[in-house]
């Protein structure tokens, strides 16, 4: 299946692009997508451990099964101070 991944500004800056297209197995989860991104984009590896994933505008768990054509948005938590 194909999904689109939208990166937050900080992730896009580290990766050099705002969107990634992924080809995943039919039963893939958010965690599977994150593993594939880490393989393809080494600059994001350390940041992927703390991202907050969203699908269809809703925060989701890493165990959420994805569907073909969905957009997975990845945001970094905001730092307080």
Please place each PLM-identified region on the residue numbering:
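Ubiquitin-like/PB1-type beta-grasp interaction modules and other compact soluble beta-rich domains
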Residues: 1-80
């Amino acid at each position: 299946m194909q999904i689109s991944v939208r990166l937050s500004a900080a992730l896009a800056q580290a990766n050099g692009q705002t969107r990634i297209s992924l080809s995943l197995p039919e039963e893939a989860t958010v965690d599977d997508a994150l593993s594939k991104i880490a393989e393809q984009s080494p600059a994001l590896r350390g940041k992927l451990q703390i991202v907050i994933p969203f699908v269809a505008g809703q925060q989701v768990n890493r165990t959420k099964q994805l569907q073909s054509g969905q957009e997975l948005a990845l945001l970094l938590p905001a730092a307080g101070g």
